[in-house]
Amino acid sequence: MAMAYKMATEGMNVKEECQRWFMEMKWKKVHRFVVYKIDERSRAVLVDKVGGPGEGYEELVAALPTDDCRYAVFDFDFVTVDNCQKSKIFFIAWSPTASRIRAKILYATSKQGLRRVLDGVHYEVQATDSSEMGYDVIRGRAQ
């Protein structure tokens, strides 16, 4: 039986699969990113797309629609100035300018409920266009 986590702010449910895919990304490193969407009819947060281990940041950006909101988590691997391999998990709240106002409000009010379920996120980025979440922005936040 599928378990769901209740979001207090909007009466939104976070499906158990959302946390499961996140934990697989975090601990097993079998995914590079997970994109989440809200299904307005069922009032639930669902997994929209999962990026395989060979996919990178460009594929994540390409998976985000230009006219609808999404949440995403990305496992960013990088090398520090001390030549140490590190990994940081980013939560991205994607709310493009072309998306519906209702969707923007729904995603904004439901964000914290999903964040509580995704334990282990290091940084959060809110973006309305691709320049606000460019690779250099992500790399700069991680270091």
Swiss-Prot record:
Q: InterPro entries, per this entry? A: ADF-H, ADF-H/Gelsolin-like_dom_sf, ADF/Cofilin
**Family annotation (Pfam families):** Cofilin_ADF
| Keyword match Lyase | no
The entry lists its GO molecular-function terms as: actin filament binding
Limits of the ADF-H domain: 11-143
One GO biological process term = actin filament bundle assembly
* Matches recorded under SMART domains: ADF
Query: Which UniProt key words apply to this protein?
Result: Actin-binding
Q: Name one GO cellular component term.
A: actin cytoskeleton
PANTHER family according to UniProt: COFILIN-RELATED
Family in the record? Belongs to the actin-binding proteins ADF family.
Q: What is the name of this protein?
A: Actin-depolymerizing factor 5
Q: Which organism is it from?
A: Oryza sativa subsp. japonica
